[in-house]
Amino acid sequence: MIKIYDTMTRSLRKFVPLTENTVNMYVCGPTVYNYIHIGNARSAVAFDTIRRYFEYTGYQVNYISNFTDVDDKIIKAATQAGVSPKELSDRFIAAFIEDTKALGVKPATQNPRVMDYIAEIISFVESLIEKDFAYEADGDVYFRVEKSEHYAKLANKTLSELEVGASGRTDAETALKENPLDFALWKSAKAGEVSWDSPWGFGRPGWHIECSVMATEILGDTIDIHGGGADLEFPHHTNEIAQSEAKTGKTFANYWMHNGFVTVDNEKMSKSLGNFVTVHDMLQTVDGQVLRFFLATQQYRKPINFTEKAIHDAEINLKYLKNTLQQPLTETADEQELKQFVIAFQDAMDDDFNTANGITVVFDMAKWINSGSYTEPVKSAFEKMLAVFGIVFEEEVLEVDIEALIAKRQEARANRDFATADAIRDQLAAQGIKLLDTKDGVRWLRD
């Protein structure tokens, strides 16, 4: 039985899906104006692991993660680069996909983009105005926070506490607002900005409305799980709840999940502090699986400190697991012992996806395997556990198989069947085996 720590209730709750055997998840994706750093990647990896565990236990998962391709930061970066916002966002969407693929993140069921939902966003805003939850002011449209009952329920604070703690993350206070916490649903266009026509003039969506529209358009008025980084709890997720529930009159999400930060010297990794390393740069020297494994060593809600030693340890531990998988199979293994490992792994992951405890079970099982208990069922169970963490090792070609293929190639060459000989060379090359034809015969090496 899976239990989830729900930010809304500040408690562990048994997971009960809206539809049996199906999980509908929406996870806030990146604002695509630059390469993602390790801290950004944690959210992608954490929720991918959660998705994978749901699938491990038999659920079908509809996993939606958006790309914010309309934003002040994108407009600014595009202007500086001398390209259009779409060109810039396309470039960094491609980079995000490449980086997360290297981290073993599965493709989302859908990756909606804001630019594709402008008509739906305008319709959503019109509905809020009709219900008196929003008001137009000189081409801008704001959400009326004081009309929203229990506005701060996710943050578990009063309105006055939120005002003090917003730290510049709410819209800049203007004379047009009825309340400093009122937030923009639609922003009037400035000269030269990307914009769309609307009932309030040319403009573009506010940040928060985008996720509400894409989530409800794809998954419906109520979804099972909404996730994102802990920094999104307020104002982003707070505002998503307010506007979504104002429009539909229904609970927006049944479970709210937030991942912790990656820290450097115990301080949050962020672009503003300048203490970040991009995934793109890290992948030049560190294997993506190593980064992934490092991010899995702590339970998703806890902070994780980024150090060279932590990355080195992750690399060493991955090599150990890979070597374990390559052990020769044995004829027997204690079936009850195997069952206990599987139960222990599920107990760990059922407890709010506790990857740290899950990994402990994996290493205990590896020690057992290396003591001489490695049948085909054991190997299958072990590989499935590793796959939950996105760790999948490609099967290495055995030396005996390489030698057999080389002999077959030599025979083909002797028979002047060069097409077959070349095909075998290509087959081995695709598996990382390079052939060297010398006067003393054929030598081979792993590329």
From Swiss-Prot:
Keywords: Aminoacyl-tRNA synthetase, ATP-binding, Cytoplasm, Ligase, Metal-binding, Nucleotide-binding, Protein biosynthesis, Zinc
GO biological process, one term: cysteinyl-tRNA aminoacylation
EC number(s) given by UniProt: 6.1.1.16
Entry-linked InterPro entries: Cys-tRNA-ligase, Cys-tRNA-synt_Ia_DALR, Cys-tRNA/MSH_ligase, CysS_C, Rossmann-like_a/b/a_fold, tRNA-synt_1_cat_dom, tRNAsynth_Ia_anticodon-bd
Cellular component GO terms held in the UniProt record: cytosol
Residues holding ATP: 271
Cofactor remark from the record: Binds 1 zinc ion per subunit.
Motif 'HIGH' region mapped to chain: 30-40
SMART domains xref list: DALR_2 (SM00840)
Subcellular location as annotated: Cytoplasm
Domain of life assignment: Bacteria
Homology family: Belongs to the class-I aminoacyl-tRNA synthetase family.
Protein name per the record: Cysteine--tRNA ligase
Originating organism: Streptococcus pyogenes serotype M6 (strain ATCC BAA-946 / MGAS10394)
Lineage of producing organism: Bacteria, Bacillati, Bacillota, Bacilli, Lactobacillales
Gene: cysS
